């Protein structure tokens, strides 16, 4: 009875998207889940066949209209697995209600799922069900996580413009982090294992939200896990290194305490906090780096009323998204409890349906908890820009470290000389290095380091450091490439296109080179790392913005003729570089010690 009341009381805060266009949207995940097409090809194929998807053409159906039989069946199955499994005795009723009982995981179209998934996965636990350790849900969760983690992953964020797509994710294993979080929720809950969805409303170092799971032990302690992680291990929350700012745990129940504390009507709260079905768990993720953030009244753009809600906002492209809140205090200003650093924030208030800036951006130091503001001064500095996005998210550039350029007069390179070794990952599109060798070579090549898949986009060898035209010859190398369409062969390294690349089929042993026909001296090498097109691209139209007095100010538009941009901007300003021609990977940064530092 109490479980039914729990669900019914919270029905008004949940809903589904329904309608015929939803079927076409689901086809994206189904086709991608076959593993035979790249995501962009899947999207193009479905859009050609079905037309573009529009979320606003779907019907929003409140759960207050839920089929009573569906609800009853869900409750009966949830109680069945809770009571029959040996670990169920160590799952509290409250955790059962929040993390096993719910009939949905998001805004997906409702359909029966418990019995089907139970029948598929429950037999996998037969061998351990009789063990004493099976009374601890963490022990069983680890066994199940090992199984889920071993399956195929068809990851893409390209389809993230629609609702959750429901229990079919268990079969298709296709989508983004939110979809793989759903997958784990369905399987764990179908077997009576408590499992939650953990949320960053906005990544601390990215422009989008992020999702993962938490499993629980017999004492109710939670452990971070994700099918998308490198390993299947259940880890303590404070071992999660990603900059987070704030972390929330999705619940089925409405956080009525949060609403009461805010003291505002629903329409006067930002939509992210209008009907919050989540609770703040930042403290367990931040651990020893958990901070109380205080911004004094002197840092506000204007004076606020006492107890006015102030939102802690994180950057998303050129905008700012609320990820936390507190009530303004005329004496102290804004005091936010439980905040993790290494994130740039800005304060705002919610007025007339939008967030109004109330402070300059500032960085909260992760270790010390100290605050550093980005304030545009009168002094200008010259900045040299090489990319528009953090190179940490360009995984391929690091694969060039310890890569080596070699010369030889033996086709098999049994006797070879080292021309240059890459000691640091490249930070720009075109990298020029000098060669100190008096010998002449007929054969030259780039040999990739261990576990690099010989990732490289371009290599060019020059007889003289003054030459602008590279040497040419017959392309040689190790055949075989990763991918579905053979588009990443070694021949790409000499096609003159920095956006095609070599991705060798094996992690080690790959190389790409030239047979120059006759021996040549080599004085210069120019190379380009395999990349995701976030370096400065010749002739694209770029615009640099700097943050000043609550808004982004343009420093001008330019079309570069090289792989760098030069601007003059106020010293100490927060910056953002936009490519108006193509792409979407862009992020706030500062210019410090002669380099771009992204946040």
Over which residues does each language-model region extend?
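Short amphipathic beta-strand segments in non-cytosolic proteins
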Residues: 307-327, 406-416, 420-421, 532, ...
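Structural motif
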Residues: 281-282, 292-307, 392-395
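Structured interaction patches on ligand/partner-binding surfaces of diverse proteins
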Residues: 351-379, 589-599
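Short acidic/polar inter-strand loop motif in beta-rich domains
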Residues: 350-360, 450-455, 581-587
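Short Pro-Gly-centered beta-turn/loop motif in secreted/extracellular proteins
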Residues: 332-353, 438, 568-571
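Secondary-structure boundary elements
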Residues: 1-172
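Disordered, acidic Ser/Thr/Pro-rich linker "stalks" and the adjacent N-terminal cap
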Residues: 377-440, 452-524, 528-537, 583-599
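Hydrophobic/aromatic-rich core segments of domains that either
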Residues: 127-147, 156-167, 173-267
């Amino acid at each position: 009875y109490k479980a039914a009341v729990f669900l019914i009381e919270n029905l008004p805060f949940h809903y589904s998207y329904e309608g015929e266009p939803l079927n076409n949207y689901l086809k994206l995940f189904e086709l991608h889940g076959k593993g035979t097409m790249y995501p962009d090809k899947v999207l193009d194929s479905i859009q050609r066949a079905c037309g573009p998807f529009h979320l606003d053409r779907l019907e929003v159906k409140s759960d207050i209209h839920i089929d009573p039989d569906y609800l009853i069946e869900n409750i009966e199955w949830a109680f069945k697995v809770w009571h029959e499994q040996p670990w169920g005795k160590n799952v509290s009723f409250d955790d059962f209600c929040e993390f096993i009982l719910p009939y949905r995981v998001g805004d997906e179209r409702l359909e029966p799922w418990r019995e089907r998934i139970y029948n598929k996965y429950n037999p996998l636990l037969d061998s351990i069900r009789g063990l004493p350790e099976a009374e601890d849900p963490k022990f069983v969760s680890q066994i199940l996580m090992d199984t889920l983690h071993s399956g195929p992953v068809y990851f893409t964020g390209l389809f993230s413009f629609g609702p959750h797509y429901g229990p079919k994710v268990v079969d298709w294993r296709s989508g983004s982090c939110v979809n793989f979080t759903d997958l784990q929720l369905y399987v764990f809950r179908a077997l009576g294992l408590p499992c939650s969805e953990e949320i960053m409303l906005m990544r601390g170092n990215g422009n989008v939200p992020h999702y993962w799971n938490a499993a629980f032990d017999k004492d109710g302690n939670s452990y971070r896990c994700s099918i998308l992680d490198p390993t299947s291990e259940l880890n303590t929350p404070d071992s999660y290194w990603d900059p987070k700012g704030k972390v929330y745990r999705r619940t089925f129940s409405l956080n009525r305490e949060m609403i009461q504390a805010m003291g505002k009507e629903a329409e006067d709260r930002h939509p992210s906090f209008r009907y919050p079905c989540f609770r703040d768990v930042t403290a367990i993720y931040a651990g020893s780096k958990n901070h109380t953030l205080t911004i004094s009244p002197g840092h506000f753009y204007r004076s606020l009323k006492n107890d006015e809600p102030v939102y802690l906002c994180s950057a998303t492209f050129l905008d700012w998204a609320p990820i936390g809140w507190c009530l303004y205090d005329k004496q102290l200003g804004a005091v936010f409890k439980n905040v993790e650093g290494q994130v740039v924030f800005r304060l705002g208030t919610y007025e007339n349906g939008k967030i109004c800036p109330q402070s300059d951006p500032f960085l909260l130091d992760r270790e010390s908890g100290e605050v550093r503001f980005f304030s545009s001064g009168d002094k200008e500095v010259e900045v040299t820009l090489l990319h528009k996005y953090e190179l940490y998210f360009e995984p391929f550039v690091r694969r060039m470290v310890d890569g080596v350029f070699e010369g030889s007069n033996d086709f098999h390179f049994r006797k070879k000389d080292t021309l240059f070794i890459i000691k640091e990952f490249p930070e720009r599109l075109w990298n020029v290095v000098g060669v100190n060798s008096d010998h002449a070579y007929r054969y030259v090549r780039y040999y990739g380091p261990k576990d690099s898949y010989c990732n490289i986009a371009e290599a060019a060898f020059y007889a003289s450091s003054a030459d602008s035209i590279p040497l040419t010859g017959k392309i040689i190398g190790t055949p075989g490439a990763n991918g579905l369409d053979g588009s990443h062969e070694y021949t790409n390294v000499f096609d003159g296109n920095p956006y095609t690349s070599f991705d060798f089929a094996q992690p080690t042993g790959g190389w790409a080179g030239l047979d120059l026909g006759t021996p040549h001296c080599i004085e210069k090498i120019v190379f380009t790392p395999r990349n995701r097109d976030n370096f400065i691209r010749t002739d694209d139209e770029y615009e640099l913005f700097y943050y000043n007095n609550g808004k982004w100010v343009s420093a001008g538009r330019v079309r570069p003729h090289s792989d760098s941009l030069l601007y003059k901007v106020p010293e100490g300003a927060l910056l953002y570089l936009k490519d108006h021609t193509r792409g979407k990977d862009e992020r706030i940064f500062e210019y410090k010690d002669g380099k771009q530092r992204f946040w």
